[in-house]
């Protein structure tokens, strides 16, 4: 979900189009707007003892575009496959209602990915209660 991120852009968009949360299709039937941010620390505490973690990034303002590079050593780049997970519907609604370009959506919102861990390629699947995906790979520049 939104993870407490992007509400400024949503509010600006609603003001521009003279809409309210109540009257817009963004607010109607959209529990994602009120869903609390997931707390990842219990999962990370567990995983630190189970698998080698090479990097971690909480995906907040700046989306994957700005947050993943912050945890990458010089010379390495994250290559994200934005088709590797199903983006929650709230982001499509925001993009459509606000006429927000896809690249701006990638810079502002997490698009459904709230936290990333970087693991060696031989780590296959992580068994936990939080849905997760392999979303890309790390490459040398």
Language-model features and meaning:
Residues 3, 12-141:
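Glycine-/charge-enriched secondary-structure boundary and capping motifs
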